[in-house]
From Swiss-Prot:
It is found in: Cytoplasm, Nucleoid. Residues 5-52, 81-124 form the SpoVT-AbrB domain. The lineage of its organism: Bacteria, Pseudomonadati, Pseudomonadota, Gammaproteobacteria, Enterobacterales. One of its GO terms (biological process) is negative regulation of DNA-templated transcription initiation. CDD domains: MraZ_C, MraZ_N. Keywords: Cytoplasm, DNA-binding, Repeat, Repressor, Transcription, Transcription regulation. One of its GO terms (cellular component) is cytoplasm. The keyword Cytoplasm applies. Pfam families: MraZ. Gene3D superfamilies: Transcriptional regulator MraZ domain (3.40.1550.20). Negatively regulates its own expression and that of the subsequent genes in the proximal part of the division and cell wall (dcw) gene cluster. Acts by binding directly to DNA. May also regulate the expression of genes outside the dcw cluster. Belongs to the MraZ family. One of its GO terms (molecular function) is transcription cis-regulatory region binding. This is Transcriptional regulator MraZ.
Length: 152
C-alpha cells in the first residue's frame, strides 16, 4: 500500500528517484517493473507496479471496442501506458510524452494512493490540494453512505 506525498526531482534525462522506503516493496512485488499512464480526469500520471497494472489491463480487455466511451478509455489508458524498470539506484525513466502530458519538468510530487502512485507537477499538486479543501468546505452535496460511515 502506498501513502503519503513526497517531493522529488526529475533529473535532466527525465528520471525520478523512488524514495528509499518504497524500493524494497517494489522490488519484492514486481522486481522493480512499473507501468505509467495518464490520469483521465486530472493533470497527473498514474504509476502502478506491473502486477497491479496487469489487473487493470484484464479489466480493460473486457471493455467493448465497439462502445465509443469504452474504446476511448482503452485508447487513452493503454495508448499512453509505458513500462519502466527501476534501476539499481532506484530511478525510473518516465517517457517524454507522459512528462509533457502532466507538465512534469523538475519538481514533482509522488503521491501514494493505495495501489498506485500519482505523479504531479509540484505547483499543480498544491493547487489541487487547495481546490479540494475549498470544495469540501463549500459543498452542499449530501455525503455518500460510504463517506458517512468513514470515521476519522
Amino acid at each position: 500500500m502506498f501513502r503519503g506525498a513526497t517531493q522529488i526531482n526529475l533529473d535532466s534525462k527525465g528520471r525520478l528517484t523512488v524514495p528509499t522506503r518504497y524500493r524494497a516493496m517494489l522490488n519484492e512485488e514486481s522486481q522493480g517493473q512499473m507501468v505509467c499512464t495518464i490520469d483521465l480526469h486530472q493533470p497527473c500520471l498514474l504509476l502502478y507496479t506491473l502486477s497491479e497494472w496487469e489487473i487493470i489491463e484484464e479489466k480493460l480487455s473486457r471493455l467493448s471496442s465497439m462502445n465509443p466511451a469504452e474504446r476511448r478509455v482503452q485508447r487513452l489508458l493503454l495508448g499512453h501506458a509505458s513500462e519502466c524498470q527501476m534501476d539499481s539506484a532506484g530511478r525510473l525513466l518516465l517517457a517524454n510524452t507522459l512528462r509533457q502530458h502532466a507538465g512534469l519538468v523538475k519538481e514533482v510530487m509522488l503521491v501514494g494512493q493505495f495501489n498506485k502512485f500519482e505523479l504531479w507537477d509540484e505547483q499543480a499538486w498544491y493547487q489541487q490540494v487547495k481546490d479540494d479543501i475549498a470544495a469540501e468546505q463549500s459543498t452542499q452535496e449530501p455525503l455518500s453512505v460510504r463517506l458517512q460511515e468513514l470515521s476519522l
